[in-house]
């Protein structure tokens, strides 16, 4: 595995690889890799001749009161996870390398961002789309891999890739969970012992809602109210949202049908956790 820290070298490598006909699987991350990221890397390894992993904590996607400075970082651990999962190139640029001067252009996302996490984090998805536009141009991937834990992000990325005719296939990868159902996340380290015991109730609330939908409930408000009440009963967390939308359009639905997402965000003392399920309802 080769570690690359400059845009110029990474772009030179990927241009040569693509010119020689090699397929490139790309996994963009902010580091502090866990089993969820490893799953993305293994999927990329299965489907491509070359795997490129990026580790970059992107300042553009953090708001003024968010956790940029305390976002967990451990490059030695990330290198080990990368090597264990067959990465060929680890792209590890500095902020100065990615943004040598103030951006004169950013990508503004106008749909799919005014709900869920986007409602709470104005500018977040513009930051995500801007850094991905840069990373796609640097790594020139055939396929790029994203976990469905950030399902809104996946919907936004699929939209912007289609809108700008970017020649990359976006591959959705299912959420990876702990044995008790908690979605794996770099931010889980911020949970206290007591909160860690409560956190699996996020997924349990979604499973309960799914059972009600499969039993015939079609009223979206009834389902989201059930989820909120369940989380408020079984955790000390504060429900930020529990919402149901069409997916991937993220349009509001009153009656549940077609492809939908049920998504939640819950604030604990030092961390905000998100989770979701997607399902097709006939």
UniProtKB/Swiss-Prot annotation:
SUPFAM superfamilies found in the cross-reference section: Nucleotidylyl transferase
GO molecular-function terms, A-Z: ATP binding; pantoate-beta-alanine ligase activity
Domain of life: Bacteria
Residues in the signal sequence: none
Residues involved in (R)-pantoate binding: 61, 153
GO cellular component, one term: cytosol
Keywords in alphabetical order: ATP-binding, Cytoplasm, Ligase, Nucleotide-binding, Pantothenate biosynthesis
One GO term (biological process): pantothenate biosynthetic process
Catalyzed chemical reaction(s): (R)-pantoate + beta-alanine + ATP = (R)-pantothenate + AMP + diphosphate + H(+)
Ranges that cross the membrane: none
E.C. designation(s): 6.3.2.1
Binding positions (ATP): 30-37, 147-150, 176, 184-187
Keyword Flavoprotein: no
Chief place where the protein resides: cytoplasm
Residues binding beta-alanine, per UniProt: 61
Pathways per UniProt: Cofactor biosynthesis; (R)-pantothenate biosynthesis; (R)-pantothenate from (R)-pantoate and beta-alanine: step 1/1
Cellular compartment(s): Cytoplasm
EC class of the enzyme, as a word: ligase
Residues at the catalytic site: 37 (proton donor)
Quaternary structure and interacting proteins, as annotated: Homodimer.
Miscellaneous section: The reaction proceeds by a bi uni uni bi ping pong mechanism.
Family the entry assigns: Belongs to the pantothenate synthetase family.
Function (record text): Catalyzes the condensation of pantoate with beta-alanine in an ATP-dependent reaction via a pantoyl-adenylate intermediate.
Name the record gives this protein: Pantothenate synthetase
Organism: Bacillus cereus (strain ZK / E33L)
């Amino acid at each position: 595995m080769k570690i690359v820290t400059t845009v110029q070298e990474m772009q030179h490598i990927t241009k040569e690889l693509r010119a020689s006909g090699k397929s490139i699987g790309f996994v963009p991350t902010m580091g502090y890799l866990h089993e969820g990221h490893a799953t993305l890397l293994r999927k990329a390894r299965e489907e491509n001749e070359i795997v490129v992993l990026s580790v970059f904590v992107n300042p553009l996607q953090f708001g003024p009161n968010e956790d940029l400075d305390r976002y967990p970082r451990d490059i030695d651990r990330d290198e080990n996870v990368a090597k264990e999962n067959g990465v060929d190139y680890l792209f590890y640029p500095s902020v100065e390398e990615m943004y040598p001067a103030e951006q004169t252009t950013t990508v503004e996302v106008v749909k799919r961002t005014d709900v869920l996490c986007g409602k709470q984090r104005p500018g977040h998805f513009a930051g995500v789309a801007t850094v991905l536009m840069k990373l796609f141009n640097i790594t020139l991937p055939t396929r790029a891999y994203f976990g469905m834990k950030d399902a809104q992000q996946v919907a936004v990325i699929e939209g912007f890739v289609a809108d700008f005719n970017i020649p990359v296939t976006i591959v959705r990868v299912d959420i990876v969970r702990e044995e008790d159902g908690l979605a794996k996340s770099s931010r889980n380290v911020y949970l206290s012992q007591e909160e860690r015991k409560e956190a699996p109730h996020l997924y349990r609330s979604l499973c309960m809602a799914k059972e009600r939908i499969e039993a015939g409930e079609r009223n979206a408000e009834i389902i989201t109210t059930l989820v909120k009440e369940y989380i408020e009963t079984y955790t000390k967390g504060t429900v930020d949202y529990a919402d149901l939308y069409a997916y991937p359009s993220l349009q509001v639905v009153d009656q549940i049908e077609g492809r939908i997402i049920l998504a939640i965000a819950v604030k604990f003392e030092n961390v905000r956790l998100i989770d979701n399920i997607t399902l097709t309802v006939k």
